[in-house]
Protein backbone atom coordinates (compact mmCIF):
# COMPACT_ATOMS: atom_id res chain seq x y z
CA UNK A 1 0.00 0.00 0.00
CA UNK A 2 1.06 3.57 -0.67
CA UNK A 3 -1.61 5.77 0.97
CA UNK A 4 -0.82 8.83 -1.13
CA UNK A 5 1.05 8.78 -4.43
CA UNK A 6 2.43 12.00 -5.83
CA UNK A 7 4.04 12.07 -9.25
CA UNK A 8 1.39 9.57 -10.36
CA UNK A 9 1.84 10.40 -14.04
CA UNK A 10 5.47 9.19 -14.02
CA UNK A 11 5.88 5.61 -15.25
CA UNK A 12 6.71 3.35 -13.66
CA UNK A 13 5.70 5.04 -10.42
CA UNK A 14 5.94 3.83 -6.83
CA UNK A 15 2.57 2.08 -6.90
CA UNK A 16 3.37 0.29 -10.18
CA UNK A 17 6.58 -1.00 -8.60
CA UNK A 18 4.94 -1.85 -5.29
CA UNK A 19 2.19 -3.91 -6.91
CA UNK A 20 4.69 -5.65 -9.19
CA UNK A 21 7.00 -6.49 -6.29
CA UNK A 22 4.14 -7.73 -4.09
CA UNK A 23 2.58 -9.63 -6.98
CA UNK A 24 -0.89 -8.38 -6.08
CA UNK A 25 -3.81 -7.28 -8.20
CA UNK A 26 -5.85 -5.40 -5.62
CA UNK A 27 -7.84 -2.42 -6.89
CA UNK A 28 -5.68 0.65 -7.38
CA UNK A 29 -7.96 2.77 -5.18
CA UNK A 30 -7.21 0.44 -2.25
CA UNK A 31 -3.47 0.21 -2.87
CA UNK A 32 -3.21 3.98 -3.27
CA UNK A 33 -6.39 5.79 -2.20
CA UNK A 34 -5.04 9.19 -3.27
CA UNK A 35 -3.01 9.88 -6.40
CA UNK A 36 -1.77 13.23 -7.61
CA UNK A 37 0.26 14.07 -10.72
CA UNK A 38 2.26 16.82 -9.03
CA UNK A 39 5.40 15.36 -7.41
CA UNK A 40 4.96 17.38 -4.23
CA UNK A 41 4.22 16.70 -0.57
CA UNK A 42 0.71 15.17 -0.33
CA UNK A 43 -0.90 18.18 1.38
CA UNK A 44 0.55 20.56 -1.20
CA UNK A 45 -0.39 18.33 -4.16
CA UNK A 46 -3.92 17.86 -2.79
CA UNK A 47 -4.34 21.61 -2.25
CA UNK A 48 -3.10 22.34 -5.77
CA UNK A 49 -5.58 19.81 -7.23
CA UNK A 50 -8.44 20.90 -4.95
CA UNK A 51 -8.89 17.38 -3.57
CA UNK A 52 -9.00 17.16 0.23
CA UNK A 53 -7.38 14.07 1.76
CA UNK A 54 -9.59 12.18 4.21
CA UNK A 55 -7.49 10.17 6.66
CA UNK A 56 -10.46 7.88 7.43
CA UNK A 57 -10.61 6.95 3.74
CA UNK A 58 -6.96 5.86 3.95
CA UNK A 59 -7.69 3.90 7.16
CA UNK A 60 -10.60 2.06 5.53
CA UNK A 61 -8.44 1.10 2.54
CA UNK A 62 -5.70 -0.08 4.93
CA UNK A 63 -8.16 -2.17 6.97
CA UNK A 64 -9.57 -3.73 3.79
CA UNK A 65 -6.11 -4.68 2.48
CA UNK A 66 -5.01 -5.88 5.92
CA UNK A 67 -7.99 -8.25 6.03
CA UNK A 68 -7.09 -9.63 2.57
CA UNK A 69 -3.38 -10.28 3.11
CA UNK A 70 -1.21 -12.01 5.70
CA UNK A 71 1.45 -9.30 5.36
CA UNK A 72 0.85 -5.68 4.41
CA UNK A 73 3.75 -3.37 3.61
CA UNK A 74 2.90 0.33 3.64
CA UNK A 75 5.35 2.53 1.75
CA UNK A 76 5.96 5.95 3.21
CA UNK A 77 5.55 9.29 1.54
CA UNK A 78 8.85 11.11 1.88
CA UNK A 79 10.00 11.55 5.47
CA UNK A 80 7.98 11.08 8.63
CA UNK A 81 7.29 14.81 8.98
CA UNK A 82 5.86 15.24 5.49
CA UNK A 83 2.32 16.65 5.79
CA UNK A 84 -0.50 14.51 4.47
CA UNK A 85 -3.03 17.15 5.47
CA UNK A 86 -2.41 20.55 7.01
CA UNK A 87 -1.99 19.13 10.53
CA UNK A 88 -1.52 15.38 9.98
CA UNK A 89 1.89 13.99 9.12
CA UNK A 90 3.28 10.67 7.88
CA UNK A 91 4.33 9.96 11.48
CA UNK A 92 0.71 10.36 12.60
CA UNK A 93 -0.45 7.90 9.94
CA UNK A 94 2.16 5.32 10.98
CA UNK A 95 0.92 5.59 14.57
CA UNK A 96 -2.77 5.54 13.58
CA UNK A 97 -2.32 2.36 11.54
CA UNK A 98 -0.28 0.70 14.30
CA UNK A 99 2.69 0.06 12.02
CA UNK A 100 6.35 -0.66 12.66
CA UNK A 101 8.79 1.44 10.65
CA UNK A 102 11.65 0.28 8.47
CA UNK A 103 13.74 3.43 8.09
CA UNK A 104 15.48 3.75 4.72
CA UNK A 105 18.28 6.31 4.88
CA UNK A 106 20.20 7.93 2.08
CA UNK A 107 23.74 6.87 1.28
CA UNK A 108 25.18 10.36 1.32
CA UNK A 109 26.61 13.03 3.58
CA UNK A 110 24.05 14.16 6.16
CA UNK A 111 22.63 10.74 6.82
CA UNK A 112 23.80 10.68 10.46
CA UNK A 113 21.59 13.62 11.42
CA UNK A 114 18.66 12.59 9.23
CA UNK A 115 18.72 8.96 10.37
CA UNK A 116 19.10 9.56 14.10
CA UNK A 117 16.43 12.30 14.15
CA UNK A 118 13.99 10.08 12.27
CA UNK A 119 14.50 7.09 14.56
CA UNK A 120 14.40 9.17 17.75
CA UNK A 121 11.18 10.88 16.65
CA UNK A 122 9.57 7.54 15.83
CA UNK A 123 10.67 6.14 19.19
CA UNK A 124 9.38 9.21 21.05
CA UNK A 125 5.96 8.49 19.53
CA UNK A 126 6.23 4.81 20.54
CA UNK A 127 6.45 3.59 16.95
CA UNK A 128 8.52 0.38 16.83
CA UNK A 129 11.50 0.65 14.48
CA UNK A 130 12.06 -2.67 12.69
CA UNK A 131 15.46 -1.68 11.32
CA UNK A 132 17.56 0.66 9.23
CA UNK A 133 18.56 0.33 5.57
CA UNK A 134 21.32 2.42 3.99
CA UNK A 135 20.27 3.12 0.41
CA UNK A 136 22.61 4.42 -2.29
CA UNK A 137 19.61 5.23 -4.51
CA UNK A 138 20.83 8.31 -6.33
CA UNK A 139 24.57 7.95 -6.14
CA UNK A 140 27.36 5.53 -6.57
CA UNK A 141 28.92 4.42 -3.33
CA UNK A 142 31.19 7.48 -3.19
CA UNK A 143 31.37 7.23 0.58
CA UNK A 144 31.56 3.81 2.23
CA UNK A 145 29.07 3.20 5.08
CA UNK A 146 31.77 3.73 7.70
CA UNK A 147 32.54 7.21 6.35
CA UNK A 148 28.84 8.10 6.47
CA UNK A 149 28.68 7.14 10.14
CA UNK A 150 26.64 3.96 9.66
CA UNK A 151 28.13 2.28 12.78
CA UNK A 152 27.44 5.43 14.84
CA UNK A 153 23.86 5.58 13.58
CA UNK A 154 23.25 1.97 14.60
CA UNK A 155 24.89 2.49 17.99
CA UNK A 156 23.07 5.77 18.74
CA UNK A 157 19.65 4.48 17.74
CA UNK A 158 20.08 0.92 19.07
CA UNK A 159 18.32 -0.27 15.90
CA UNK A 160 19.49 -3.20 13.78
CA UNK A 161 20.87 -2.80 10.28
CA UNK A 162 18.76 -4.53 7.65
CA UNK A 163 21.35 -3.99 4.97
CA UNK A 164 23.11 -1.65 2.60
CA UNK A 165 21.60 -1.28 -0.87
CA UNK A 166 24.06 -0.43 -3.64
CA UNK A 167 23.31 2.04 -6.40
CA UNK A 168 21.97 0.25 -9.49
CA UNK A 169 22.38 2.48 -12.54
CA UNK A 170 20.26 0.28 -14.81
CA UNK A 171 17.45 -0.36 -12.34
CA UNK A 172 14.76 -0.63 -15.01
CA UNK A 173 16.61 -3.44 -16.78
CA UNK A 174 17.72 -5.08 -13.53
CA UNK A 175 14.39 -4.94 -11.68
CA UNK A 176 13.93 -8.71 -11.24
CA UNK A 177 17.54 -9.12 -10.17
CA UNK A 178 17.13 -6.27 -7.69
CA UNK A 179 13.99 -7.79 -6.22
CA UNK A 180 15.83 -11.08 -5.72
CA UNK A 181 18.66 -9.21 -4.02
CA UNK A 182 16.23 -7.51 -1.65
CA UNK A 183 14.32 -10.66 -0.82
CA UNK A 184 17.51 -12.43 0.19
CA UNK A 185 19.01 -9.60 2.21
CA UNK A 186 16.25 -7.52 3.76
CA UNK A 187 13.24 -9.66 4.46
CA UNK A 188 13.51 -11.95 7.45
CA UNK A 189 10.85 -13.59 9.58
CA UNK A 190 11.57 -11.28 12.51
CA UNK A 191 11.34 -8.08 10.46
CA UNK A 192 7.58 -7.93 10.17
CA UNK A 193 5.97 -10.58 12.37
CA UNK A 194 2.45 -11.59 11.38
CA UNK A 195 -0.06 -10.73 14.10
Q: Residues of each region from the PLM?
A:
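Phosphate-binding/switch loop-helix module in NTP-utilizing enzymes
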Residues: 42-84, 91
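C-terminal lobe/tail of nucleotide-utilizing enzymes
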Residues: 120-195
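A general structural detector for well-ordered alpha-helical segments in enzyme core domains, enriched
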Residues: 14, 58-61, 90-93, 118, ...
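P-loop NTP-binding module
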Residues: 63-76, 98-101, 183-190, 195
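Inter-motif core of Ras-like GTPase G domains
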Residues: 85-108
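N-terminal phosphate/diphosphate-binding loop that engages ATP/GTP or pyrophosphate donors
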Residues: 1-52, 56, 63
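Short internal beta-strands
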Residues: 2, 102-105, 130-136
Amino acid sequence: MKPVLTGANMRPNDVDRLMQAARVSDPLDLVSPYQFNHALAPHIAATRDGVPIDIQHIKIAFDTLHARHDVLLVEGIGGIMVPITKDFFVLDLIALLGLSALVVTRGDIGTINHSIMTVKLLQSHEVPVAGLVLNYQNTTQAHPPEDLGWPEILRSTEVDSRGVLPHISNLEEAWDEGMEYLSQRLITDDLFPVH
